Amino acid sequence: MAAKWEKKDNNQGELTFEIAPDKIKEGLDKAFQRTKKNLAVPGFRKGRVPRQIFNQMYGEEALYQDALNIVLPEAYDAAIKEAGIEPVDQPQVDVESMDKDQPWVLKAVVTVKPDVKLGEYKGLSVTKQNTRVYQKDIDAEIEKQRQQQAELVLKEDEAAAKGDTVVIDFDGYVDGKQFDGGKADNYSLELGSNSFIPGFEDQLVGHKAGEDVDVKVTFPADYQAEDLRDKEATFKVTIHEVKEKQLPELDDEFAKDVDEDVDSLEELEAKTKDRLKEQKVTAAHDAIEDEAISEAVDNAEIAAVPEAMLKDDIDRQMDQYLANMQQQGIEPKMYFQLTGTTEDDLRKQFADGAEKRIKTNLVLEAVVEAEKIEPSEDEVAAEVKDLASQYGMEESAVRSALSDDMLKHDIAIKSAVDLIADSAKQDKKKDAEDDE
């Protein structure tokens, strides 16, 4: 009997399939070899009992469950391939029949990917993107570089102003008691940077080096340390130094300091314009891509996403995020302590976008099928080369880590994204256009 698939409600169905007698025999043989190793039968050394004696004493049926566990994975994989379905979680498998010398018949309750009915996905209307670089953009970028080149110079007997940097000792108290993280010595703080609790920096403006200041603040309601939220605190602050920024002149020498490949401020501005143009073009492409794909997803009819797919997506996002933290030397436990969050908080954060991510992928897969996108071997080889270069790996290592099917799937999805984005028409105006 060929595998038989019967679709039910809620993305589930019943898959009925058989395990052939020759495969059953292989499973029984392996099951017996495992079982007899620890079997002690009077008259035989441990692990040496003949198969015939075992069958007489216990019956061959005693091996059925172990044999089924051995042969089921291969039989199930073959059945889902024959039925042309894509399960999204582990099936619930029940035995229909296990008759001697007959195929074993099994029935699995399987959850599959939701059905997708594509709507319009080519030639979609998207917002027109402005990639023009204005002089104000160039000036702002040059000013940012100027700020980065600034030197901090001591202010002698002058009061601190916004934009100045103060070097301070501080010691915080809540209800007259010190608290963790509330004390530091020789701390450099730029006034106006808003890196401290609201109100802290403002109260240091107007004070000079050598002065002691009592700073009174209230911790925000969303402060990361829950025990300090909405609490009033007093920080005893000693100002050791007040420094102001000394900005370099906007001239050719400044340009050379910023970029050794230019000889003048004019050249720096031209190079900055080119770089900003490239950034705007990239940002515009990304915006068009995001809007077009989002519209294609909205246009599609998609059945409810199974819980198993949502859980799998959230797990994958969390694992990837925490792995990135570990690469930066931050273990998960330390991350949750530093952020004042829990694993459940992080799960909720990723849960918010899980359904959208899954539906997007489902639509892209449907586009791949509709457009009959089939990556070539040359495209696979190019993808392997790119990944090897990106991650500093040998190409052979990439091929070992990723199967051809995985590589072809990723390439096909990228092609579907390009098809949707490249065919989009920029004919929607932004709410407020820049007329400069």
UniProtKB/Swiss-Prot annotation:
Keywords for this protein: Cell cycle, Cell division, Chaperone, Cytoplasm, Isomerase, Rotamase
Matching entries from PROSITE patterns are given as:
FKBP_PPIASE
Enzyme class, first EC level, given as a word: isomerase
**What Gene Ontology terms describe where this protein resides (cellular component)?**
cytoplasm
Enzyme Commission code(s) on record? 5.2.1.8
Q: Where is the protein localized?
A: Cytoplasm
Residues in PPIase FKBP-type domain copies: 163-248
Q: Which InterPro entries match?
A: PPIase_dom_sf, PPIase_FKBP_dom, Trig_fac, Trigger_fac_C, Trigger_fac_C_sf, Trigger_fac_ribosome-bd_bac, Trigger_fac_ribosome-bd_sf, Trigger_fact/SurA_dom_sf
Identify the domain of life.
Bacteria
Among the GO molecular function terms of this UniProt record, one is: ribosome binding
> GO biological process annotations for this chain's record?
'de novo' cotranslational protein folding; cell division; chaperone-mediated protein folding; protein transport; protein unfolding
PANTHER family xrefs: TRIGGER FACTOR CHAPERONE AND PEPTIDYL-PROLYL CIS/TRANS ISOMERASE, TRIGGER FACTOR-LIKE PROTEIN TIG, CHLOROPLASTIC
Task: Write out the domain note.
Answer: Consists of 3 domains; the N-terminus binds the ribosome, the middle domain has PPIase activity, while the C-terminus has intrinsic chaperone activity on its own.
The family annotation for this protein states: Belongs to the FKBP-type PPIase family. Tig subfamily.
Name the chain's protein: Trigger factor
- Organism name: Levilactobacillus brevis (strain ATCC 367 / BCRC 12310 / CIP 105137 / JCM 1170 / LMG 11437 / NCIMB 947 / NCTC 947) (Lactobacillus brevis)
